[in-house]
């Protein structure tokens, strides 16, 4: 069975990144957790995962803490694989947390009397590019992607020149 514990090291990194690059998250509740072992998805190791907790699970958190839940309860959770974290360099750790923070969004309603809405965003090319600009090719999968892009550009040039 998978176990989870709080991840203060991830939280420290996230706080700095939020201040620098993700200011829309400054007043958003985020919990940081270690997952004891990495999950896998489609044959790939999952280093981290961003989640939105709302509804019954969010209310249950307040019940366990023995405080009164607000009318609308929602928060984010960043889950990081503790076993894989140990294999990463410090710059890779920062890049991983930055990448996961890119998935956390806040929709501001047009009506002044409406509440903001927390959303999980998919992989966005602009945000992906921003993380690569800030941290470089921090994972082998990103290097593989770059090589594929380079190969495609070479093929396009050959077809254009040929």
Feature-to-residue mapping (PLM):
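Active-site recognition of the HExxH zinc-binding catalytic motif
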Residues: 95-107
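Metalloprotease/metallohydrolase-associated module, dominated by Zn2+-dependent proteases
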Residues: 1-30, 34-91, 107-162
